[in-house]
């Protein structure tokens, strides 16, 4: 039976994908006590294709970047479900970190990262409010 969070996702039209397997020498998540840390996610959509490809401030618009960040957050939720079995077990989203593929001079990474942050609040309510780091980089895998 789906929990409250999964019902909320379903009512929003969000289907969690099969969690991605690691592409190098790391694990998808680590649990230490009551803290769960999830490895970085790539912006694959439900169809298995990249939601956006290219640099923000170049070929990718802020709106498409936000969609990509949201896709990463959905993939993060899939990893959480794999780790916990039930998303209702999430007591709090503590921190999100986002690496934004950015052209030189692009400074709106925080606006892009809102695509992920907004989803956490949409799904978890006040428990989804979190600390955050957003870093612009010149290239990313994928």
How should each PLM-predicted stretch be described?
Residues 1-142:
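Short, polar/acidic, helix-capping and beta-turn segments at strand->helix junctions
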